[in-house]
Regions:
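Cytoplasmic-side transmembrane-helix entry/capping segments in multi-pass membrane proteins
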Residues: 8-17, 67-77, 126-134
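Short, highly charged, low-complexity non-transmembrane loops/tails of multi-pass membrane proteins
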Residues: 186-195
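Hydrophobic alpha-helical transmembrane segments in multi-pass integral membrane proteins
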Residues: 24-35, 81-95, 139-154
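Hydrophobic membrane-spanning alpha-helices of multi-pass integral membrane proteins
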Residues: 76-84, 106-111, 133-144
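Structural signature of hydrophobic alpha-helical transmembrane segments
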Residues: 36-51, 97-108, 164-167
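Membrane-helix boundary elements
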Residues: 62-66, 73-98, 118-119
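C-terminal ends of transmembrane helices
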Residues: 1-7, 53-68, 113-125, 176-182
Length: 195
């Protein structure tokens, strides 16, 4: 399990193959009613989140800032708690229990970090890293929709429609900026990418 990699080279993108993979597999298993497999895969994703999350937070707190082009990948820090929240709702029948509230609490913390990062995100050149917002924020919207249903919130249908409209507009903006960047030749980094 030894990896020849400097701490400064780590970034939140490493959550995707392990944490997201395990949690999404748990959600899929839960959808098919495979309880034991969903629990196993949830454990896999959760433990990977704890281990990698510790490494990544250490990197973000103690090492030089990520290159400007990679700043948007910090948005992935919001993904584990909201994806885990979505999966937990699928596993427990949509109840807002203790685990759901713990995941929501951490999701709120990471969402507040995202709000504080807006000025930094605005300085980053638009490129592929911005597509992490698509997965992360749609997972967050889905988690909010699960919460609205679990809490039987007033106006939940209207709030859901607003959230879905905002998500759709976000995807449209990403797609539009991507196409413009591709046409201008500014979307992809120059090869070879600078370290």
């Amino acid at each position: 399990m030894r990896v020849e990699m400097r701490l400064v080279d780590w970034n939140p993108g490493y959550f995707l193959p392990t944490v997201a993979g395990g949690l999404l597999a748990a959600g899929g298993a839960a959808a098919f009613g495979w309880v034991r497999l969903s629990e196993l895969m949830f454990g896999f994703g959760f433990i990977c989140w704890v281990v990698l999350g510790s490494i990544l937070l250490l990197r973000l707190f103690t090492q030089p800032a990520l290159p400007n082009r990679l700043l948007p990948v910090i948005a992935i820090e919001l993904a584990p708690p909201v994806v885990a929240g979505n999966v937990w709702f699928a596993m427990n029948g949509g109840r807002a229990d203790f685990v759901a509230r713990v995941l929501a609490g951490y999701a709120l913390l990471m969402a507040s970090v995202q709000l504080s990062m807006i000025p930094s995100y605005r300085t980053a050149p638009f490129g592929p890293a911005f597509w992490v917002f698509a997965f992360t924020y749609v997972a967050a919207v889905t988690d909010v929709i699960f919460w609205l249903k679990a809490e039987d919130a007033d106006y939940s249908k209207a709030i859901t429609y607003v959230l879905l409209a905002l998500s759709t507009l976000g995807y449209a903006a990403l797609a539009t900026r991507t196409v413009k960047g591709m046409i201008r030749g500014t979307f992809l980094p120059e090869y070879p990418a600078a370290r």
